[in-house]
């Protein structure tokens, strides 16, 4: 009996079983109870921390997630977990949502505590990486969907991501081409990573089309629908001239659409909204969301491939940039 058998009997993914074993909070209580009962009935002994500490040569890969409740990262975690298990390793998942500061120290502690062979970081605050930031980490590191304004220390880690500035630029240009005058940017303004680059693309698109950048139309907020709804609701009550919203994530776009509708606006006739990420739920919303689709499956697969390459061959670190796709749906006005 192995973890794949437990997953099959439970009707869930391998990564879900791994989260249950590691007592991760991102599991429904009913699912947790079902998996634990099957583990008990099967007399399955998990390769947990107690066993890890007895081993000199562990085969554990850490996945450190900032935004574990974000569907985008949840889907990537499942893909990564399955590949890790298929290669004979165990995924140790740890969420990092409550650390508001730099995540390098968190990663160092994670590697040492769990005695990892390597670590993949999904999201996170790595904006102040220095040349000596990875001195205490003796295992391969892959930063995925992590953009940093720092160019230092890149030879000490690998990365997988997209060109966030270029992708955001294309999305805002798409809005502008639909004769939109006042475009509202919705994101995490104080984030100097992914959000910084997406707002950079937003500003470039406005500037190149001779549209003034109105600071009142760049609203900071957490990456969730509730905060987005509150921020858009407040702005629309003050500004009746808004004709477009560029949301830095699909989750934010969901809240923005609800706020627009609650303010009596028709989406997209009165206001157009574009999201970012391309999460699966975006195509089932009403209206379905025009979005910048990230290649999450390819990002997840490439992250694990890079990590295993570094573990098995001791090769050089690489930095991979993948293409995005602007998916046209119903939340934008069609010319």
UniProtKB/Swiss-Prot annotation:
InterPro entries: HTH_LacI (IPR000843), LacI/GalR-like_sensor (IPR046335), Lambda_DNA-bd_dom_sf (IPR010982), Peripla_BP_I (IPR028082). Disulfide bonds: none annotated. One of its GO terms (molecular function) is DNA-binding transcription factor activity. The keyword Electron transport does not apply. It holds the Pfam family Peripla_BP_3. Keywords: DNA-binding, Repressor, Transcription, Transcription regulation. Signal peptide: none annotated. This is HTH-type transcriptional regulator MalR. It comes from Clostridium butyricum.
């Amino acid at each position: 009996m192995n973890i794949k058998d437990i997953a099959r009997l439970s009707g869930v993914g391998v990564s879900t079983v791994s989260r249950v074993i590691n007592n991760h909070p991102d599991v429904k209580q009913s699912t947790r109870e079902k998996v634990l009962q099957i583990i008990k009935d099967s007399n399955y002994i998990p390769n947990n921390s107690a066993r890890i500490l007895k081993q000199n040569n562990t085969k554990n890969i850490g996945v450190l997630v900032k935004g574990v409740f974000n569907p985008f990262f949840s889907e990537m975690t499942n893909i990564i977990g399955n590949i890790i298990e298929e290669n004979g390793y165990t995924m140790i998942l740890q969420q990092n949502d409550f650390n508001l500061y730099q995540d390098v120290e968190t990663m160092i502690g994670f590697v040492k505590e769990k005695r990892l062979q390597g670590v993949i970081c999904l999201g996170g605050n790595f904006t102040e990486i220095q040349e000596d930031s990875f001195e205490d980490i003796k295992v391969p590191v892959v930063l995925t969907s992590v953009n940093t304004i720092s160019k230092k220390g890149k030879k000490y880690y690998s990365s997988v991501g997209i060109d966030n500035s270029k992708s955001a630029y294309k999305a805002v240009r798409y809005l502008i081409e639909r004769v939109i005058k006042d475009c509202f940017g919705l994101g995490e303004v104080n984030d100097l990573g992914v959000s910084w680059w997406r707002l950079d693309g937003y500003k470039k698109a406005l500037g190149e089309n001779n549209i003034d950048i109105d600071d009142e139309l760049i609203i900071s907020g957490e990456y969730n629908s509730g905060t987005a709804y509150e921020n858009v609701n407040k702005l629309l009550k003050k500004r009746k001239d808004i004709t477009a919203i560029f949301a830095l994530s699909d989750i934010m776009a969901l809240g923005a659409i609800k706020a627009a509708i609650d303010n009596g606006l028709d989406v997209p006739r009165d206001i157009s909204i574009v999201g970012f990420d391309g999460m699966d739920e975006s195509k089932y919303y009403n209206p379905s969301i025009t979005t910048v689709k990230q290649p999450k499956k390819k990002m997840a697969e490439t992250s694990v491939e890079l990590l295993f390459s570094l573990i098995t061959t001791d090769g050089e670190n690489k930095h991979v940039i993948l293409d995005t796709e602007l998916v046209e749906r119903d939340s934008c006005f069609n010319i």
